[in-house]
Design a protein with these regions (language model features):
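N-terminal presequence-like segments and the immediate start of the first folded domain
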Residues: 1-17, 134-135, 152
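Mobile beta-alpha loop/short-helix "lid" or hinge segments that flank ligand
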Residues: 5-13, 110-125
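Glycine-rich phosphate/diphosphate-binding loop of Rossmann-like nucleotide-binding domains
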Residues: 11-53
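Active-site rim loops that border cofactor/substrate pockets in soluble metabolic enzymes
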Residues: 43-72
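Glycine-rich phosphate-binding loop
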Residues: 61, 65-102
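Short, acidic/small-residue loops that bind anionic groups at enzyme active sites
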Residues: 92-120, 139
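Phosphate-binding/catalytic loops
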Residues: 121-140
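A charged, well-structured terminal subsegment
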Residues: 134-155
Length: 155
């Protein structure tokens, strides 16, 4: 499904001055996750937002990592990963756990957590969603823009 996400031009960048964000990426599928992180970093650089990038073992660890970083004083987080469908129910359990966990952290902390965890049937889908800077749907870029938009909303 295609839609529109905020653009840097549509946001009040003065409203986000002084914010700091944690970009947290899973280590599985580095060829995809590194591109997602690069997309998020590109957005935050362009918006002149301070960021630090961290890695965790896998996508299941993303919610706790986001919570820890928000507890350490970060104003928001972006979580990035790839869960690839296999032959067992593992995919369903991981996807549900990560999605619920990330949402709960954001609600509990009242801070934005951009969701850039891909849940794909095959590698081609993941590649399509992790192209950097081509304006064609890097989900790391979109997750970063979502954080910026929520900071705008909170002002």
């Amino acid at each position: 499904m295609a839609g529109t996400s905020p653009t840097l031009e549509s946001l009040n960048l003065k409203a986000i001055k002084g914010k700091k964000v944690a970009i947290i990426s899973a280590q599985w599928h580095p060829e995809i996750c590194d591109n997602l992180a690069a997309g998020a970093e590109m957005i935050f650089k362009a918006a002149q937002v301070e960021y630090e990038t961290f890695t965790v073992s896998g996508s299941f660890e993303l919610p706790l990592a986001a919570q820890l970083k928000l507890d350490q004083g970060f104003d928001g987080a972006v979580v990035l990963g790839l869960v690839m469908r296999g032959d067992t129910a593992h995919f369903d359990y991981i996807c549900q756990g990560v999605t619920s966990g990330v949402m709960q952290v954001s609600l509990d902390k009242s801070k934005p957590v951009g969701f850039g965890v891909l849940m794909c049937d095959n590698l081609a889908q993941a590649v399509e969603r992790s192209n950097v800077g081509l304006g064609i749907g890097n989900k790391g870029e979109e997750a970063a823009l979502a954080v910026l938009a929520l900071w705008n909303l909170a002002k």
